[in-house]
């Protein structure tokens, strides 16, 4: 799930933190990818007639199809991917996982009912909600990656946290995930949409943590408190506290301790803290997640030549893929993983640090831009209100 509305908050209040671009812009870079999130998206997206792809033996192959062809696309564009798999979830995540499981059961029942009475759209919608990544899906994807010569590592708990460690250490350029909580684990750069299909034509989003903090006017501790208040995987959100309110509360009070105190002492009782809301524990999970250090031997990785015959046996003989396509893909892998060794020019130049005056000027321009946006919103709201109040037919 990640952090609710965090991308909206950053894009509206720290627009300089977000860059959009094409996948080819990341040529020559190493990227750590949240494998479990990617596999989930493959199971949802790689479908035929609303159903997951199956082998002749009735085994699901959507995850393998997605992993093979999306990884090929990444490598074709000169990127060297490293996949990171989730380990056991933190205990605090148990409540959220239980809720997801309950929602999936409800969706499964609704899907069965839609088969009898609903439309094709209803069936597709509820079918997608029943999807979950199993241990077997993970193991098959690991086998595939090994045959492709693409490295992977197993995280002790959260894959996003491990990706962030590798990015902070400079072992990869960025962490790639659709989960915005990757930023809470202090990933310097987060890439979104990297494993999307080419047909979706979604630009790659590149989110820079330092610019997000600068634009929001927060330090890392306040940013994590904001994310907890927005709603994370570890705690249920405070009812009626949306993104604008969460941002206002953190800016006004500076920390969750003071926010909670203000809410509890409010005579109007506008907001109510849930009975069991251990935000200090959630904060600790973001600050000190269970991860392997970047110099851990298990975090050593390298890209190798694909095992062509092994791929043919696994994907063609066992899973029913097209042999021509698999062999063609293996040839592209072998060629492009070598090409990706080329260095980017930026690696030879050290960026020049901005002066205090330049930073102040950038902040002033940013503040003026935000004020202008607020002014436009007020004017639009006023115009809509006047239009509604105007008698029908009046000019």
From Swiss-Prot:
Biased composition (Basic and acidic residues): 356-389
PROSITE patterns: XPG_1 (PS00841), XPG_2 (PS00842)
Cofactor binding remark: Binds 2 magnesium ions per subunit. They probably participate in the reaction catalyzed by the enzyme. May bind an additional third magnesium ion after substrate binding.
Binding site for Mg(2+) 2: 179, 181, 233
GO terms assigned for molecular function: 5'-3' exonuclease activity; 5'-flap endonuclease activity; DNA binding; magnesium ion binding
Region of interest called Disordered, as start-end residue ranges on this chain: 94-124, 356-395
One Pfam entry name: XPG_N
Gene3D superfamilies: 5' to 3' exonuclease, C-terminal subdomain (1.10.150.20), 5'-nuclease (3.40.50.1010)
Top-rank taxon: Eukaryota
Residues at which Mg(2+) 1 binds: 34, 86, 158, 160
Keywords: DNA damage, DNA repair, DNA replication, Endonuclease, Exonuclease, Hydrolase, Magnesium, Metal-binding, Mitochondrion, Nuclease, Nucleus, Phosphoprotein
Region annotation Interaction with PCNA: where it falls in the sequence: 341-349
A GO cellular-component term linked to this record: nucleolus
Enzyme class: hydrolase
Keyword DNA repair: yes
Ranges where the record places region I-domain: 122-253
InterPro entries hit by this protein: 5-3_exonuclease_C_sf, Flap_endonuc, HhH2, PIN-like_dom_sf, XPG-I_dom, XPG/Rad2, XPG_CS, XPG_DNA_repair_N
Cofactor(s) it depends on: Mg(2+)
Subunit structure: Interacts with PCNA. Three molecules of fen1 bind to one PCNA trimer with each molecule binding to one PCNA monomer. PCNA stimulates the nuclease activity without altering cleavage specificity.
Main function: Structure-specific nuclease with 5'-flap endonuclease and 5'-3' exonuclease activities involved in DNA replication and repair. During DNA replication, cleaves the 5'-overhanging flap structure that is generated by displacement synthesis when DNA polymerase encounters the 5'-end of a downstream Okazaki fragment. It enters the flap from the 5'-end and then tracks to cleave the flap base, leaving a nick for ligation. Also involved in the long patch base excision repair (LP-BER) pathway, by cleaving within the apurinic/apyrimidinic (AP) site-terminated flap.
Similarity field: Belongs to the XPG/RAD2 endonuclease family. FEN1 subfamily.
Protein name: Flap endonuclease 1
Organism: Talaromyces marneffei (strain ATCC 18224 / CBS 334.59 / QM 7333) (Penicillium marneffei)
């Amino acid at each position: 799930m990640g952090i609710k509305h965090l991308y909206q908050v950053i894009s509206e209040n720290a627009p300089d933190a977000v860059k959009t671009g094409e996948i080819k812009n990341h040529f020559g870079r190493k990227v750590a990818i949240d494998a479990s999130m990617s596999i989930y998206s493959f199971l949802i997206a790689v479908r035929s007639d609303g159903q997951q792809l199956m082998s002749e033996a009735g085994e699901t192959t959507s995850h393998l199809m997605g992993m093979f062809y999306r990884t090929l696309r990444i490598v074709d564009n000169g990127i060297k991917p490293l996949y990171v798999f989730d380990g056991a979830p933190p205990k605090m995540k148990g409540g959220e996982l239980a809720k997801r499981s309950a929602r999936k059961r409800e969706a499964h029942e609704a899907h069965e009912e839609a088969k009898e009475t609903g439309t094709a759209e209803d069936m597709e919608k509820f079918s997608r909600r029943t999807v979950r990544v199993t241990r077997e899906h993970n193991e098959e994807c690991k086998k595939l990656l090994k045959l492709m010569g693409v490295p992977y590592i197993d995280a002790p708990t959260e894959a996003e946290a491990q990706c962030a460690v590798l990015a902070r250490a400079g072992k990869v350029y960025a962490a790639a995930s659709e989960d915005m909580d990757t930023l809470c684990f202090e990933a310097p750069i987060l890439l979104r949409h990297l494993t999307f299909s080419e047909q979706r034509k979604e630009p790659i989003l590149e989110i820079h943590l330092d610019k997000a903090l600068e634009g929001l006017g927060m330090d890392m501790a306040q940013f994590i408190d904001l994310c907890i208040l927005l709603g994370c995987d570890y705690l249920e959100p405070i009812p009626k506290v949306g993104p604008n309110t969460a941002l206002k509360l953190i800016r006004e009070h500076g920390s969750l301790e003071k926010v909670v105190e203000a809410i509890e002492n409010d005579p109007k009782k506008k907001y109510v803290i849930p009975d069991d809301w251990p935000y200090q524990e959630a904060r600790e999970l973001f600050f000190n997640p269970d991860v392997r250090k970047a110099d851990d031997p298990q975090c050593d990785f390298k890209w190798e030549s694909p095992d062509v015959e092994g791929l043919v046996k696994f994907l063609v003989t066992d899973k029913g893929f097209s042999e021509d396509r698999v062999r063609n893909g293996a040839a592209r892998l072998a060629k492009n993983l070598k090409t990706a060794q080329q260095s980017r020019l930026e690696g030879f130049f050290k960026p020049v640090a901005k002066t205090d005056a330049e930073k102040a000027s950038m902040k002033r321009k940013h503040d003026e831009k935000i004020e202008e946006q607020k002014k436009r919103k007020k004017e639009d709201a006023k115009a809509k209100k006047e239009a509604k109040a105007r008698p029908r037919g009046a000019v």
